[in-house]
């Protein structure tokens, strides 16, 4: 039996090769080959897929199977995709190819090194067992549908460096509870986080200048969204939310002290420009006090004119007075001074109740 280090390639019959990564045996090689001009792969009998070499992986496409109504990537390890449990991408690989790990339904662990600069479209499409992903600061772009329908994905760590999050990148990641969008991001594509129904808070940094249609649609448990100063246009259905609980409201906070416009959409010769936030009753839209009259009198925003409230630059909470002695029940829609939904109600604090009152006491 032949042992090899992780940075070496052993040209032996795959049935006789056992790989060691950081001193630990990974198992016997059961498949191997090329997946890039200077990039190779090895699959071990513990279903760890190792990608190694220098440069980019090939971009692959996919095929649809009518027999089981499934998509299958045209990758050399396609016969193993339902069994692959771990993917180890070694330093030197600069791009994760399109459809590379599509439908690897047993995949739970992925290592992305600092050499990777981009993640291709559909790269981890429907990896339904993947729970966590760390994206290093070397990555500047996440391709379309890269993590589409990774339904078990709870945690995504994206480091500063990423510039573009493409359309559908995290669409239907229904278990995703938190996403920290780095300050380096300038563009969020259409439906990028559509259907991320476990998200409760989104902070969009000032560097973002473009948010595509439906980017956060159907994130029906969103409670707080802060939109940075770089966003000047809100496109159709960006925050189209349908709350099943009528007591839940989403607080949308604009930070720009210049007008944010609603883009128009033409559909069957009909012009629409007021579907950004679904029903006005579901949202509280907080804007700088200097912009409040603009929004309330704007024809574009007329559907939401009663949803707006203002805050001053010296009072970031937007609250200039407190109605002492008011109270709220636990059934009320209660928010803290940052506009975030309160789930644990503490005594002798100041809160926003149903978007109208400010209180400092609770009663059961």
Q: What residue spans do the PLM features occupy?
A:
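Boundary at the C-terminal end of the N-terminal hydrophobic targeting segment
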Residues: 4-6, 23-27
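LRR flanking "cap" motifs
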Residues: 34-95
């Amino acid at each position: 039996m032949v042992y090899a280090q992780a940075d070496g390639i052993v040209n032996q019959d795959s049935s006789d090769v056992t790989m060691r990564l950081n001193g630990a045996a990974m198992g016997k090689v059961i498949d191997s080959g090329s997946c890039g001009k200077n990039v190779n792969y090895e699959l071990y009998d513990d279903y760890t897929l190792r990608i190694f070499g220098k440069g980019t992986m090939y971009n692959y496409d996919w095929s649809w199977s009518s027999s089981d109504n499934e998509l299958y990537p045209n990758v050399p390890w396609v016969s193993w995709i339902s069994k692959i449990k771990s993917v180890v991408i070694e330093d030197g690989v600069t791009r994760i190819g399109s459809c590379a790990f599509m439908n690897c339904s047993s995949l739970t662990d992925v290592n992305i090194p600092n050499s990777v600069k981009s993640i291709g479209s559909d790269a981890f499409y429907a990896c339904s067992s993947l729970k966590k992903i760390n994206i290093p600061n070397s990555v500047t772009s996440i391709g379309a549908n890269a993590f589409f329908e990774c339904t078990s994905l709870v945690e995504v760590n994206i480091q500063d460096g990423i510039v573009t999050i493409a359309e559908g990148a995290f669409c239907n990641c229904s278990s995703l509870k938190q996403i920290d969008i780095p300050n380096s991001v300038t563009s969020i594509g259409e439906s990028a986080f559509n259907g991320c129904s476990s998200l409760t808070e989104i902070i969009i940094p000032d560097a973002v200048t473009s948010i595509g249609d439906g980017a956060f649609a159907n994130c029906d448990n969103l409670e707080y969204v802060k939109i940075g100063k770089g966003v000047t246009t809100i496109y159709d259905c960006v925050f189209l939310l349908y709350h099943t609980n009528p007591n839940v409201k989403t607080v949308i906070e604009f930070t720009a002290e210049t007008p944010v416009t609603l883009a128009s959409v033409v559909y069957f010769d009909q012009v629409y420009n007021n579907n950004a936030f679904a029903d006005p009753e579901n949202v509280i839209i907080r804007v700088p006090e200097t912009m409040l009259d603009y929004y309330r009198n704007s024809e574009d925003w007329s559907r939401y004119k009663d949803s707006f409230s203002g805050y001053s630059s010296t009072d970031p909470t937007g609250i200039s007075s407190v109605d002492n002695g008011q109270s709220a029940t636990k059934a009320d829609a209660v928010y803290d001074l940052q506009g975030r939904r309160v789930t644990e109600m503490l005594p002798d604090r100041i809160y926003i109740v149903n978007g109208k009152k400010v209180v400092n006491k609770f009663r059961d």
